[in-house]
Amino acid sequence: ARARSPEHRSGLVVLPTGTGKTEILIADLIEQYKKNNSLKVLILVPTKQLKIDTIKKVNHRFENELHVKVFIGEEKNSQILIQTYSWMSRYYQNFNSLDFDYIAVDEAHHAVAPTLQKVIQYFNPQMLLGLTATDKRLDEKSLAEIFGKYESNLTLVEAIKQDILAPIKAFRVKSNIDLSEVRFNGKDYYSTDLQKTVIAPSRDQLIVDVLKKYFVDKTMPFKSGLIFCVSVVHAKKVAKLLQDNEISCKAVSGN
């Protein structure tokens, strides 16, 4: 209600991953279309896969809950246009700044990045809504610059206590790796430094030993898992090592 008052034309939804940020957006869009079925909407997402998933979700909810045909898709003339940051950063000037009544930014912690910020500030929507689980950036840039003042109303711990999310079980494995010399650029670690430091045969073997002892013992029920590696090459090395130890594994990447 606060975001809908005349003096508030922007807002930010800050909720842990898996607690329904996209569902909140879709529910709000449905309510707005009930009031105005000619509304033009832009939803910005970071990846092609998220674009595909969001198109499916929005279409499904609109078909089931709204008795008005709305053209939803990735085409420029869509009534609800769902596109990636990169696509819109290339083509945003092909649009009029007043083309969209409502703009939503998924993974909105990226909104203060120069390229995406330029896109957002080009348009003049009646409503700008950001969705994120991580409103605190490592470079300390404030999302309030884009979305105005906001409050985080549900923490990860609270979501678990309310049975919205499953409890987290964490196991910490000590190794002799020293990360103090790995450079950090304010956003992420340098990949070259990580590869020199983290990729070590002894450490890779430790991963295998821990998995064999606690997760893939023959007396235990089958478990599946995901291992994040430093690089594609590292992923292939770890997969080969697991396979050599009779643990079913496959290396996958975005390449």
PLM segments and residue spans:
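Conserved interdomain linker/interface between the two RecA-like ATPase lobes of SF2 helicase motors
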Residues: 150-226
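Post-DEXD/H (motif II) to motif III coupling segment of the RecA-like Helicase ATP-binding lobe
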Residues: 109-171
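Walker A/P-loop
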Residues: 7-28, 224, 228, 252
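Conserved helix/coil segment N-terminal to the catalytic DExD/H
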Residues: 72-102, 113-118
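Conserved helicase motor "Helicase C" RecA-like lobe of SF1/SF2 P-loop NTPases
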Residues: 229-253
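Conserved Walker B
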Residues: 103-109, 235
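Pre-Walker A adenine-sensing motif
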Residues: 1-5
